[in-house]
Amino acid sequence: MANHKSSIKRIRKSQIRRLRNKYYAKTARNAVKNIRGTADKVQAGVLYKKVSKMLDKLAKKNVIHNNKANNLKSKLALYVNSLN
């Protein structure tokens, strides 16, 4: 167990950050699933804009890796464009 005040605080802060990052990452995964489950092109296009913005913000905050965000956006764009 940690002996110093600063290390105890650092552990506490890292746990809070871990839970926050976990929540945002899960929210993003659910949003991606919602797009992939959509068969309507118009609705998928609207959702794509929101999810794209969300992924960029998460990559900027280092919750997910920048390349992962770009790969997800690319795959989702291909999916949305393939809808009729």
From Swiss-Prot:
Record's keyword terms, sorted: Ribonucleoprotein, Ribosomal protein, RNA-binding, rRNA-binding
UniProt entry tagged with the keyword DNA damage: no
Species whose genome carries this gene: Azobacteroides pseudotrichonymphae genomovar. CFP2
Molecular functions (GO terms): rRNA binding; structural constituent of ribosome
Name the UniProt record assigns to this protein: Small ribosomal subunit protein bS20
UniProt keyword Transmembrane, yes or no: no
UniProt record similarity statement: Belongs to the bacterial ribosomal protein bS20 family.
One GO term describing the cellular component: ribonucleoprotein complex
A Pfam short name: Ribosomal_S20p
Its biological purpose: Binds directly to 16S ribosomal RNA.
Gene3D superfamilies listed in its UniProt record: Ribosomal protein S20 (1.20.58.110)
GO BP term, pick one: translation
Alphabetized SUPFAM superfamilies for the sequence: Ribosomal protein S20
